[in-house]
């Protein structure tokens, strides 16, 4: 069963150039779904289109767009507590003038009616998931943390809301190998044990082959291959996909990322 189903998604710029060309995309419920492809293919554009968060100079059309079997009219109603977004611009998610504990508490209480103590309990739990301790984080400002620490705080700020769907654009790109694998292990645990759904854009093919159940391959704005993990491990693949897997452990990052 698909949690998101969008048909004939097309994205154009102001010069009427097609960046995404009429793709059909399903994000399967309670699975880790991945979108891979080379630099400039438009992967991040698809994520932003799903969130209705495209730059003003791009236009998006589709024939139908459903979330959990219902037609979507206003996606913003799902943000936070139902759909979480992990972007690459984690450094812009926190200001430098307020302690992180206060910012995280405000984020949680914006989405859930709760006491400060309840919010802090959820924050503490989420920070532990990303291998951080509240005592080391909550009384600090964002500029006092390393880039890797701040990215993990950002991921925790999404996880603490327990969204049904997480759209993650390069969620571990700035982390070292150990913490990157730990975060991916955590995301896999959330999907397998708690029934959440993940749509991940990544250039790390080792992560794709290890963690993902369903994969889309994007080339020049078109999906050229799709299938479950067994298809990509054991069946004959499109020549382009074979080259990606054979020659690149980690793809270059997208120009549009």
From Swiss-Prot:
Domain ABC transporter: 4-245
Top-level taxon of origin: Bacteria
Subcellular location(s) of the protein: Cell membrane
Keywords: ATP-binding, Cell membrane, Ion transport, Membrane, Nickel, Nickel transport, Nucleotide-binding, Translocase, Transport
MF terms in GO: ABC-type nickel transporter activity; ATP binding; ATP hydrolysis activity
Membrane topology summary: Peripheral membrane protein
Pfam families: ABC_tran
Catalytic activity: Ni(2+)(out) + ATP + H2O = Ni(2+)(in) + ADP + phosphate + H(+)
Binding site for ATP: 37-44
Subunit annotation: The complex is composed of two ATP-binding proteins (NikD and NikE), two transmembrane proteins (NikB and NikC) and a solute-binding protein (NikA).
Listed name of the protein: Nickel import system ATP-binding protein NikD
Lineage: Bacteria, Bacillati, Bacillota, Bacilli, Bacillales
Gene, per the UniProt record: nikD
């Amino acid at each position: 069963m698909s949690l998101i189903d969008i048909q004939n998604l097309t994205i154009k710029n102001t010069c009427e150039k097609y960046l995404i060309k009429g793709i059909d995309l399903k994000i399967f419920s309670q699975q880790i779904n991945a979108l891979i492809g080379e630099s400039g293919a438009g992967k991040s554009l698809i994520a932003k289109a799903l969130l209705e968060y495209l730059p003003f100079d791009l236009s998006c059309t589709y024939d139908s767009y459903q979330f959990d079997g219902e037609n979507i009219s206003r996606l913003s109603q799902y943000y936070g507590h139902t759909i979480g977004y992990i972007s690459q611009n984690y450094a812009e998610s926190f200001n430098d003038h307020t302690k992180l504990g206060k910012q995280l508490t405000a984020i949680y209480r914006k989405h859930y009616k709760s006491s400060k103590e309840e919010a802090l309990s959820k924050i503490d739990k989420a920070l532990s998931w990303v291998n951080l301790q509240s005592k080391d984080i909550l009384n600090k400002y964002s500029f006092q943390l390393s880039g890797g620490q701040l990215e993990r705080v950002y991921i925790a700020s999404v996880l603490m809301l327990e969204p049904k769907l997480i759209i993650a654009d390069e969620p571990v790109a700035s982390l070292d190998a150990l913490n990157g694998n730990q975060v991916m292990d955590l995301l896999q645990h959330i999907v397998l044990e708690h029934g959440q759904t993940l749509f991940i854009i990544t250039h790390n093919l080792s992560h794709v082959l290890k963690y993902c159940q369903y994969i889309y391959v994007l080339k020049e704005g078109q999906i050229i291959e799709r299938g479950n993990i067994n298809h990509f491990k054991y069946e004959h693949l499109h020549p382009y996909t074979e080259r990606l897997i054979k020659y690149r452990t980690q793809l270059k990052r997208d120009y549009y990322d």
